[in-house]
A protein has these predicted regions:
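Conserved motor-coupling elements within RecA-like helicase/translocase cores
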Residues: 304-322, 335-339, 548, 560-564
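Conserved helicase motor
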Residues: 74, 278, 300-310, 325-331, ...
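Structural recognition of the conserved hydrophobic beta-strand(s) that form the central parallel beta-sheet
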Residues: 137-138, 322-324, 344-345, 385-390
Length: 564
């Protein structure tokens, strides 16, 4: 801003606008600071004859115009003197904090680095932490990225510097993080579009993208622009992401890029998010309606019914982000808009969203031509561009939405610790009846016959004794099963102590489930004690207040209408 001839008072006004944001409560201060740094503000000049000046703290368009500094052991005086291992500054603003531990020392772990940032530093030096939007923890062999509010289990490695690179691991992961997330042109992109604070968060959430989300959103944006109508074919492309890898957040990041990053191409677009189940519609809506500030769009909501959809979308001139189910589109819907700056993003694009062609349906009354929901959707928005997100890319998906633009496989997701690999491992808990026990059983039945019991009744009882439920519920088998489950679970937890391991035991009926529960509780009585954490002493009062008290193991069962 050298050409603006700012006065000393105006420079101080710009600095104070940041400094005077309260640091307590820390989450509110951090979010407000981030929004100010991200969006800038309009400053009224001291000379009222001059036009108000829009001030940006970071030049996101030209990263080279910014001043980047990395400072180690920076001393900060708060309630206590603290020295974070590393701070990353952009134009004097400490936007990232890094804490390092060594993998050699057994008494310190990467989890200790997380605790140091999220507990000690947030408690003792909040005036610094309100500026720290990114948080990095490392033990040399593992390096992970999150925010200062991110739970430890949601810190993840940035395993690729560039999308086509091989996945890094071990010591190289730190260098990959630096190159992939903290290069000048990368860190500015991450801060600008890939950090999300919900408008109204009751859980102090600050979402930082993972590397597959960062690459996927940008590649999908480029492909959508290339295939947009009227010059393109309207096939915005397919994103193949493993189940549980965060596709909904990828859709949110993509929506921001569409809404804000190329006005010449999109010209205030309308974005329609399409689900195929009500529960997914609700889940997606709950996220998107808290992202109005992030999307720079006040009209973000779920479409309630067909009437609401027609009133909202018919001849809408521009803008808006809407979440709806594809089943709301039918033959009667007809044309809603022929604009070309409508972007339809289909979730679970392999299921109900590929039926654009005619099918013959034979009934008792004759043969009829039917169409899928996707055909009616395209009748409603004939010039829209369509892109699909799926965990199961089938040929029809690619034919309708276009080529797979980017993918993140289950193996990659599992290797990165984002999803848990499901593997079948047969473990037999056999129940063997000894010869002596068999003789005792036969002796009992012989006695029953001698005393006048009906032979048919005896045979029926034998069949009942050998039925599956009886075998499964044999006390010895239940005991062996419980012991094997506990041993197996604890062994897996010991292999990867940094990951929260979960287990589900499926039983034939509720009675068997109850017996298994009691058998496991007999082996590990402490598992039935309700707690908020394995070690509550490591958490602050505020953190404990946000957690629900639960036992480590519990019984979950359904109940039918005829059950007592």
């Amino acid at each position: 801003y050298a050409s603006e001839n700012l006065s000393e008072a105006e420079i101080q006004k710009i600095i104070n606008r940041l400094n005077l944001i309260p640091s307590t409560p820390l989450y509110n201060g951090n979010r407000e600071t981030f929004l100010l740094v991200n969006e800038g503000f309009d400053m009224v000049r001291d000379n009222i004859s001059q036009v108000a000046l829009h001030v940006d703290y970071i030049d996101f368009d030209e990263p080279s115009n910014n001043i980047f500094k990395v400072v180690n052991q920076y001393s900060v005086q708060g309630d206590h003197l603290r020295r974070p291992d590393l701070l990353v500054f952009i134009n004097g603003i400490p936007i990232a904090i890094c804490e390092f531990k060594t993998a050699i020392e057994e008494d310190t772990t990467i989890h200790d680095a997380w605790e140091q940032i999220t507990i000690r530093y947030t408690r003792d030096i909040p005036k610094l932490m309100k500026y720290c939007f990114l948080s990095v923890i490392s033990d040399g062999a593992n390096t992970k990225l999150g925010s200062i509010f991110t739970p430890y289990k949601f810190y993840y490695s940035w395993n690729k510097a560039n999308d086509q690179d091989k996945v890094s691991n071990g010591i190289s992961s730190l260098l990959t993080m630096v190159e992939g997330a903290f290069a000048k042109d990368r860190i500015t992109k991450v801060l600008r579009d890939f950090v999300f604070y919900p408008d109204d968060s009751k859980k102090d959430e600050a979402i930082v993208c993972r590397y597959p989300q960062f690459f996927a959103a940008q590649k999908m944006l480029d492909n959508i622009k290339e295939h947009m109508r009227p010059t393109g074919d309207g096939k915005g492309g397919t994103y193949f992401g493993a189940t549980g890898c965060g596709k909904t957040y990828t859709m949110l990041f993509l929506s921001r890029l569409i809404a804000l990053r190329d006005n010449e191409a999109f010209n205030n677009p309308t974005i329609v998010i399409l689900e195929d189940r009500e529960d997914l519609d609700t889940q997606t809506s709950e996220l998107f309606v808290t992202a109005k500030k992030y999307l720079h769009e006040n009209d973000v909501r779920s479409i309630e019914n067909r009437e609401d959809m027609e009133q909202t979308l018919r001849d809408k001139p521009s803008g808006g982000v809407y979440i709806t189910t594809i089943q709301k589109f039918c033959e009667m819907t007809g044309l809603l808009s022929d604009r070309s700056n409508i972007i339809c993003i289909s979730d679970e694009a392999h299921r109900t969203q590929t039926g654009v062609g005619a099918k013959l349906k034979k009934t008792d009354k004759g043969v009829f031509t039917t169409f899928g929901f996707a055909k009616y959707l395209r009748d409603s928005f004939p010039n829209a561009t369509y892109c699909g997100f799926t965990g199961t890319p089938i040929d029809e998906t690619i034919a309708v939405f276009g080529k797979v633009v980017d993918s993140y496989t289950m193996k990659e997701s599992s290797d990165d610790g984002i999803t848990v690999r499901i593997a079948y491992e047969p473990r037999l808990a056999r129940v063997i009846v000894s010869d002596e026990q068999a003789k005792e059983i036969q002796k009992y039945y012989d006695q029953c016959i001698a005393e006048g019991s009906n032979p048919e009744q005896v045979e029926e009882s034998k069949r009942a004794m050998s039925s599956m439920t009886t075998i499964l519920g044999h006390p010895e088998r239940i005991k062996k099963l419980a012991s094997d489950v506990v041993m197996h679970y604890e062994a897996l937890c010991a292999e990867k102590p940094e990951i929260v391991q979960k287990a589900m035991i499926v039983c034939a009926d509720r009675l068997l489930a109850f017996k298994v529960l009691k058998a496991i509780e007999a082996i590990r009585p402490d598992w039935s004690v309700a707690r908020k954490s394995e070690d509550e002493s490591t958490l602050t009062k505020d953190q404990l207040d946000k957690l629900v008290t639960l036992p480590k193991i519990n019984l979950v069962a359904t109940q039918g209408q005829n059950d007592e």
